[in-house]
Amino acid sequence: MAAITAALVKELRERTGEGMMDCKKALEKAGGDIEKAIDDMRASGAIKAAKKAGNVAAEGAIAVKTDGKSAVLLEVNSQTDFLALQDDFKNFVAESLEEAFAQKLTDAAPLIASREAAREALVAKCGENVNIRRLVRVEGDVVGAYLHGNKIGAVVVLKGGDVELAKNIAMHVAASNPEFLDASEISAEAIEREKNVFLQLNADKIAGKPGNIVENMINGRITKFKAEASLKEQAFVMNPEVKVGELAKKAGAEIVSFTYFKVGEGIEKPVDDFAAEVAAQVAAAKQ
């Protein structure tokens, strides 16, 4: 059995990120064999990762890579924004993005499978749940991408135009988050819902007004809704005097598609109620 020196403990700590006492115990259990200690700690980490799998990971980062003809947009989640700013997490995201782009992956499932060992190692080291949530790959004549910090990302596919135009429109998408490409994609159901919402919110204003006046008010709201919801009808953020669709048309381009990712979008975060938690603990203690 090799002597458990301070230098050996320090090396194991640097290689694993675990605490000094944990490293010392692992080395003692492994008979001073640092590689075996690492294997044992990874095995222990895998168990720890499984226990944390139920924790809600709603923070994280968006990453994007493009070559002008294709792009991959990726979301990786963590439990806290603090972890999302750490190098270990950033490296995991970057390596995952590179793999997805190089292998031309169109779905997150194969990436999740191939990155599972690295994910478990990261979870074991940081003590937080980490998940590869989703990815999208797009291809086209011209592809542009924009990343706002590490929280919002967008990609745009054009037919015609250039990468700079596609990037500028992607920046607009990141800022405005349109629901549809153009007004023709808006379903009758969506329009009916908007109409009903308008009527409910303005019941007092329209009470007693002639039917044609009410109809004009509804039509005005629906027109505004279509402009707000569809990318081509929105005022371009860099020049509100022109619509996004007009901008593309003037450049000899057609917007084919867009994709928008925001960290944690659609993930329900738990709401901690400290008072309720204490009350529950007191009630349990009385039983």
Swiss-Prot record:
Primary location class: cytoplasm
UniProt xrefs under CDD domains: UBA_EF-Ts
Chain segments carrying region Involved in Mg(2+) ion dislocation from EF-Tu: 80-83
Coiled-coil features, chain-numbered ranges: none
Keywords: Cytoplasm, Elongation factor, Protein biosynthesis
SUPFAM superfamilies in the cross-refs: Elongation factor Ts (EF-Ts), dimerisation domain, UBA-like
GO cellular component, one term: cytoplasm
UniProt-listed Gene3D superfamilies: 1.10.286.20, DNA helicase RuvA subunit, C-terminal domain (1.10.8.10), Elongation factor Ts, dimerisation domain (3.30.479.20)
GO function term, MF aspect, one: translation elongation factor activity
Domain of life: Bacteria
Keyword Cytoplasm: yes
Subcellular localization, as worded in the UniProt entry: Cytoplasm
HAMAP family documented for this protein: EF_Ts (MF_00050)
Family the entry assigns: Belongs to the EF-Ts family.
Record's function text: Associates with the EF-Tu.GDP complex and induces the exchange of GDP to GTP. It remains bound to the aminoacyl-tRNA.EF-Tu.GTP complex up to the GTP hydrolysis stage on the ribosome.
PANTHER family per the UniProt record, alphabetical: ELONGATION FACTOR TS (PTHR11741), ELONGATION FACTOR TS, MITOCHONDRIAL (PTHR11741:SF0)
The protein's name: Elongation factor Ts
Source species: Pseudomonas putida (strain W619)
